[in-house]
Amino acid sequence: MWTVSYAQNTSMTLDNLPEQLQKNLEAAGLADLTVDQCEIIRRFLAGERTLVSGHDGAGKLTALVIGFAAKALASRRSLETGRLPEGLLITNHPEDAIVAAALFERLTHGSGLKAAGVSIGRNVPRMREIE
């Protein structure tokens, strides 16, 4: 698990992201990322299973969605052969699922990719009852 630190006064950029994503990040006002966000994205793109913990507003969700968008946009060959990029982002709050799906579509604008937001947060107690 990667724990997001509270020292977020420095920012950096990721130059190795697909060009379309970099343009869409700038258009969305997300060109300057925190060091922690860059580390989350780096680990995600390296293929590490990424579980992130941190305070509200730390940018965890944004970083993970950027990672998903980067992988999806870099998978052009897969898209051309009809294979969809794989990924699953589980949230505890329905609002986060909606925000993640909307941000993904904004960051992949022009690619034709779509996202669906799914949250299991409110269903967990019901699932435990069924067991």
Residue ranges and their predicted role:
Residues 2, 6-53:
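Conserved pre-motif I regulatory segment
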Residues 52-68, 86-87:
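Glycine-rich P-loop/Walker A and Walker A-like loops and their local beta1-loop-alpha1 context
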Residues 19, 23, 38, 42, ...:
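Solvent-exposed alpha-helical segments within well-ordered globular domains of core cellular machineries
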Residues 34, 52-53, 76-81, 116-118:
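Active-site phosphate-binding and catalytic loops of NTP-dependent enzymes
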Residues 82-131:
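Conserved nucleic-acid-binding Ia/Ib motif block in the N-terminal RecA-like helicase ATPase lobe
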Residues 28-31, 47, 71-75, 107-114:
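Conserved, well-folded catalytic cores of nucleic-acid-processing
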Residues 34, 62, 97-98:
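Loop/helix-junction capping segments adjacent to catalytic residues or to phosphate/diphosphate-binding pockets
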Residues 41-47, 60-81:
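Walker A/P-loop NTP-binding motif
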